């Protein structure tokens, strides 16, 4: 994976030639991690030490990069596990939307079904690995389940009103756990 770092002490190797973020801007790094093909075009990046590369969505780790963050904190940076506090924010779980006939046809394509399942399984697997591999790292995950029919959507949702409803649900999720989160970090 391509992991953009801005601190040389977080690098595992090649520290003598380290360039923060590979010389990319923050917007380029974000675009590279969101280039979910086949839905979006791959992102071309000019890495200062490596030349031009084609970056694609980091679906396997970008959905929940917890293991990378904790690995960096423990290893190159050297923070003891008992001093690490990890808060991870998921997108939540929603009912499947009713689809129009053409989306039903697309959804039946094995590659699309595999992609949707892979993205869901990836984030959940990372969560399980965190608990099993790093039991001494204190960790809270916020990723609530919503069953209400008006929240039925998938990762292709583009209606801004519905997406704003998701933002509000995210705020509600935080509000419900705000005291727990504040206590966790004190």
Task: Mark where each language-model region is.
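Conserved catalytic cores and adjacent C-terminal regulatory segments
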Residues: 1-186
